[in-house]
UniProtKB/Swiss-Prot annotation:
Alphabetic keyword roster: Glycoprotein, Heme, Iron, Membrane, Metal-binding, Monooxygenase, Oxidoreductase, Transmembrane, Transmembrane helix
Glycosylation site list: N6, N145, N403
Cofactor(s) it depends on: heme
TM stretches of this protein: 30-50
Highest classification ranks of the organism: Eukaryota, Fungi, Dikarya, Ascomycota, Pezizomycotina
Annotated localization: Membrane
InterPro entries membership: CYP450_sterol_14alpha_dmase, Cyt_P450, Cyt_P450_CS, Cyt_P450_E_grp-IV, Cyt_P450_sf
Record Pfam families: p450 (PF00067)
PROSITE patterns (alphabetical): CYTOCHROME_P450
Protein name: Cytochrome P450 monooxygenase CPUR_05419
Similarity comment: family membership: Belongs to the cytochrome P450 family.
Protein task: Cytochrome P450 monooxygenase; part of the ergochrome gene cluster responsible for the typical purple-black color of the ergot sclerotia. The ergochrome gene cluster produces several ergot pigments including the yellow ergochrome secalonic acid and its derivatives, as well as the red anthraquinones endocrocin and clavorubin. The pathway begins with the synthesis of atrochrysone thioester by the polyketide synthase (PKS) CPUR_05437. The atrochrysone carboxyl ACP thioesterase CPUR_05436 then breaks the thioester bond and releases the atrochrysone carboxylic acid from CPUR_05437.
Pathway(s) annotated for this protein in UniProt: Secondary metabolite biosynthesis
GO MF entry, a single one: heme binding
């Protein structure tokens, strides 16, 4: 047995008595001490600034103490433009909380940004703070677990872009367009004496894009069940207008937008799950029963329930994020130019003889209903230019990457770097509003692509509408087809003119928008007057 000597026994008298020791302190004193300690730790955290590679670009002066460059979220384009203008090299650094970000600009930096293998797009997602997926953590469907570095998400989108699937669902998409546009004369206030009316393209075209995308990328049941579709429209609309990226800058500050993103993502999950479960259960032991839709492709691949639902939530959000707005943009702008409408109509009339017998009578719209996929994709070059110009002018956003390597990445021609562990960001307006590539860049002119400037022909990645470099839009085939279908049906069925809410003709409207805000919108007070062609 150990023999403890008196001088080795610690004095424990501090634990007893009423006048000394921590245990004798009042609860209030303990609470204040804890609060003071926590506050001190928090202030140290706020004051701490991580070290940055000395070769990183200089920091922009457009910053707020402790938070960083809030303008990245609140003034998306003007913050970027002004920071580039103040930089000697066109590159600049800024903080978002404790996250170091390098803003890059110019052709060489853009190519580096889009091509470098160590700049990861998915791991940079937290900087955006938009959409239904809250990251981190990154869900399995978005991780590069497939061949060639593809994710489950990319692999399944590519499956849905195959000709067999698009052709099999084409009629569902064209039928939806015809139904929506045909409903205009009866659903809208008609003008006396003519088969015409007035419509705001925003809501009608937005809902059309949503219903088409669900039929192409999910299943018919969601659209055909009115109550379910209305819920889907409402939840998606909320998510489209929520931005909680500032949680990167102020993670210690509660965020209502962040909470709402989680909530509406949960509501979509609850909406989609029963439909997927029903399909999975219906396939058990029934080899002969197979639906003809995207959900069936996922089920036939043996995909798990959670992966299917997560994929569907993400793919539908992405597929309508730009198309939902662009459909209204295209119609709104086309109203102001009858010459462009005539060019589209000429392409329609030139396309129908390719597949429709000359001796078989039919209206132009009936012929469109029977147009095969290969004709849709090859017969409308001017329509494609209109779409391209609409994307150039109306799809503006900051792209982000994370340097996941252990080495700094040189920014060509600057002597500066994107440090290891730092984010890189690029604003698409840097290319799309470049006067050297696009003269008078704020003027909508699809014909500029017919005779592009030499710089626009040769500059690498001068157009970013469908992504570029290592991250091209894997769903662009459907996106182009969908926008083409809607524009072609609109022109085939009606003549269009721009007007106010009372049907009075409007002079040309400036369709520029506030590029600083998230979720930009169409010009307000602009309506479309339509007159039936047939």
């Amino acid at each position: 047995m150990t023999d403890f000597k008196n001088d080795t026994i610690p004095d424990m008298s501090w634990t007893t008595g009423s006048n000394s020791g921590l245990l004798s302190s009042s609860p209030t004193t303990l609470a204040l001490a804890t609060l003071a300690t926590g506050l001190a730790v928090f202030l140290v955290y706020l004051a701490y600034t991580p070290s940055v590679d000395a070769l990183a670009p200089e920091f922009t002066s457009d910053t707020t103490p402790l938070i960083g460059s809030w303008g990245f979220y609140s003034r998306r384009w003007s913050f970027w433009r002004d920071s580039v203008a103040r930089s000697k090299t066109g590159q600049f650094s800024f903080w978002l909380g404790k996250n170091h970000v390098v803003g890059v600009s110019g052709a060489a930096a853009r190519k580096m940004f889009l091509d470098h293998q160590s700049l990861d797009r998915i791991k940079a997602a937290p900087l955006h703070g938009i959409g239904p997926e809250i990251v981190p953590p990154i869900h399995f469907v978005h991780q590069p677990n497939f061949s060639k570095g593809h994710s489950y998400f990319q692999r399944r989108v590519l499956d849905l872009m195959k000709t067999e699937h698009l052709a099999s669902r084409l009629h569902a998409a064209t039928r939806e367009a015809r139904t929506v546009f045909r409903g205009f004369p009866t659903k809208q206030t008609t003008l006396k004496g003519t088969r015409s009316g007035i419509v705001s393209p925003v809501d009608s075209c937005y809902r059309l894009v949503l219903s088409q995308s669900v039929r192409m990328m999910f299943c018919d049941e969601l659209v055909d069940t009115h109550e379910l579709f209305e819920k889907y429209v409402a939840f998606t609309h909320e998510l489209q207008h929520l931005n909680s990226g500032h949680t990167c800058a102020v993670p210690w500050l509660p965020s209502l937008a962040h909470t709402k993103r989680r909530y509406y993502r949960h509501r979509l999950h609850c909406l989609f799950t029963p439909l997927v479960e029903k399909r999975l259960q219906s396939q058990q032991g029934r080899a002969g029963s197979r639906a003809n839709d995207a959900l069936q492709i996922l089920v036939d691949n043996g995909d798990e329930l959670d992966n299917i639902v997560t994929f569907l939530i993400s793919v539908l959000f992405i597929s309508i994020a730009n198309a939902g707005k662009l459909a209204g943009v295209l119609l709104n702008i086309l109203c102001q130019n009858p010459i462009w409408q005539d060019r589209v109509l000429s392409e329609i009339n030139a396309a129908t003889p390719k597949f429709w017998p000359a001796d078989k009578p039919a209206t132009l719209v009936e012929k469109l209903d029977g147009m095969p996929l290969e004709v849709w994709e090859a017969s409308f070059p001017f329509v494609e230019l209109i779409i391209r110009e609409a994307i150039r002018m109306h799809v503006a956003f900051p792209m982000t990457r994370l340097n996941v390597s252990s080495r700094a990445i040189p920014i060509p021609g600057t002597g500066q770097v994107v440090p290891s562990g730092s984010f890189a960001a690029y604003n698409t307006n840097d290319a799309h509003l470049n006067e050297a590539l696009y003269p008078d860049p704020l003027r909508f002119d699809p014909e500029r692509f017919e005779t592009p400037r030499e710089g626009a022909k040769t500059e690498t990645y001068g157009f970013l509408g469908w992504g570029n470099g290592r991250h091209r839009c894997v769903g662009q085939r459907w996106a182009k087809l969908q926008l083409s279908i809607n524009l072609v049906y609109a022109v085939a069925m009606y003549k269009w003119n721009s007007c106010d809410a009372d049907g009075n003709a409007l002079p040309p409207v400036d369709h520029s928008f506030d590029r600083d805000r998230h979720g930009n919108q169409l010009a307000q007070g602009v309506f479309c007057k339509y007159e039936c062609r047939e």
